[in-house]
Amino acid sequence: MNLTPKERERLTIFMAAELARRRKERGVKLNHPETVAYISDWACERAREGMSVAEIRQEATALLTREDVMDGVPELVDMVQVEPMFPDGTKLVTIHDPIRADTREQLEE
C-alpha cells in the first residue's frame, strides 16, 4: 500500500483519535495530543460527510468538556487547525477555544 504523506498523516490522526475515544469511553481524562487528535478526527469526518466549515467550527466546541480532559489541557488547546477534505476540496478549519464547558450539563443548557 503506497500512501501519500497526507494520507499517512490522516491515519496517524485517526489512530490517536481512536485511542482517545477508547480512553474517554472508559472515563480516562485525555491529554493534550489525544484531545487535539479527537477534535481533528471529528472535524475531518464531518468535512468528508459534507458539513460546512462554519458548522464544524461551531459544533466542535461541544465535543469535550473540562471533565473529559486532564488539568491544564483546555488552556493548552486554545486553537485546533486541520485541513480536511471536503467534497469540493481541502480547506483550513480553525476551531478557537474548543473546550469551553466545564461539564456535559452546561453543554445541554
Swiss-Prot record:
GO function terms (MF aspect): nickel cation binding; urease activity
UniProt key word Hydrolase: yes
Residues making up the signal peptide according to the UniProt record: none
Main location per the UniProt record: cytoplasm
Domain of life: Archaea
Keyword Nucleus attributed: no
Keywords: Cytoplasm, Hydrolase
Gene Ontology CC terms: cytoplasm
Catalysed reactions, semicolon-separated: urea + 2 H2O + H(+) = hydrogencarbonate + 2 NH4(+)
Pathway stated in the Swiss-Prot or TrEMBL entry: Nitrogen metabolism; urea degradation; CO(2) and NH(3) from urea (urease route): step 1/1
Enzyme Commission numbers on file: 3.5.1.5
Root EC class: hydrolase
Protein name: Urease subunit gamma
Native organism taxonomy: Archaea, Methanobacteriati, Methanobacteriota, Stenosarchaea group, Halobacteria
